[in-house]
Amino acid sequence: MKLLIGILFCTLIMGVTGDSWYSFFKEAVQGASDLWRAYWDMRDANVQNSGRYFRARGNYEAAQRGPGGVWAAKIISNVGEYLQGFLYQIYLGDSYGLEDQVSNRRAEEWGRSGQDPDHFRPAGLPKKY
């Protein structure tokens, strides 16, 4: 636990460039809420093969907030990927879902880099999203 807190603290220090701490934390909280909203929209839409689109969209919206949003998107995406990979390894075998993880990571990086998340939009997804 101490190691995890140390890593989070170090990435936080490195993530703050010249902006004030207040704006960085505000952006981080808003970015986390963007990811949360994208997750719930994905669950609400319930459209097959839409996960990459919503991952890209959540990371895109978080990155638009600024450095704090990018930081939050990276941390949340990496922790989620780590936990998912850990559970896959324990319950389903070593390489189960590896292709999905790689394509999800690519979609998240695509969104964080500011590119259009509609690149991953599946056919049949309502315009509401």
UniProtKB/Swiss-Prot annotation:
Described purpose of this protein according to its UniProt entry: Major acute phase reactant.
The keyword Signal appears for this protein: yes
Alphabetical list of InterPro entries matching this protein: Serum_amyloid_A, Synovial_Prolif_Regulator
Annotated segments matching region Disordered: 107-129
Gene that produces this protein: SAA4
Primary localization class, coarse: secreted
Protein name from the UniProt record: Serum amyloid A-4 protein
Signal peptide: 1-18
